[in-house]
């Protein structure tokens, strides 16, 4: 990665990070890097690291910082990210935020953090009605009426960690570990808050206002 623009999309599970990150990637032409997708990819490959990641995710636990960081850093150093990128799902702890800050300073990249705000009730409603394409990892909602991915033509599946019990546990851990990260970026003047309870297109308009203000 050389000097460029990096956009970090943050928010609790079910806030629409992946959807909005992909909208932004399509609009500004930068690659979308999802740590969740990176982890699910190595899980599908069945590597030792993939099996380790699966054990954490299946019980709703966070994957260790150093483990996630090494996977993400390799992606950030690729040619695809030479002009910048959109990061979704990282950082989740202050340690991760400091690792990413140090890396971005070394390569002289500017960055903006978009924080998607959403209530717990709305999160539970969304997460319990979403399905995943096992091939491309795109998320679909039951209200869309899809039973298979329109692009990959494979049946949609429900993620093993998309249950009310696991989501509530993840939200508790999220508040404990990620709330300080939000405060940290806010103190640096890097944070822009956006409500993600509106329709997807309206949320995206608010994100663009943050970027171009």
Curated annotation (Swiss-Prot):
One of its GO terms (molecular function) is adenylate kinase activity. Catalyzes the reversible transfer of the terminal phosphate group between ATP and AMP. Plays an important role in cellular energy homeostasis and in adenine nucleotide metabolism. Residues 129-162 are annotated as: LID. Monomer. Belongs to the adenylate kinase family. Its EC number is 2.7.4.3. Transmembrane segments: none annotated. Consists of three domains, a large central CORE domain and two small peripheral domains, NMPbind and LID, which undergo movements during catalysis. The LID domain closes over the site of phosphoryl transfer upon ATP binding. Assembling and dissambling the active center during each catalytic cycle provides an effective means to prevent ATP hydrolysis. Some bacteria have evolved a zinc-coordinating structure that stabilizes the LID domain. Pathway: Purine metabolism; AMP biosynthesis via salvage pathway; AMP from ADP: step 1/1. It is an enzyme of class 2 (transferase). It catalyses: AMP + ATP = 2 ADP. PROSITE patterns: ADENYLATE_KINASE. It is found in: Cytoplasm. It comes from Chlamydia pneumoniae. Pfam families: ADK. This is Adenylate kinase.
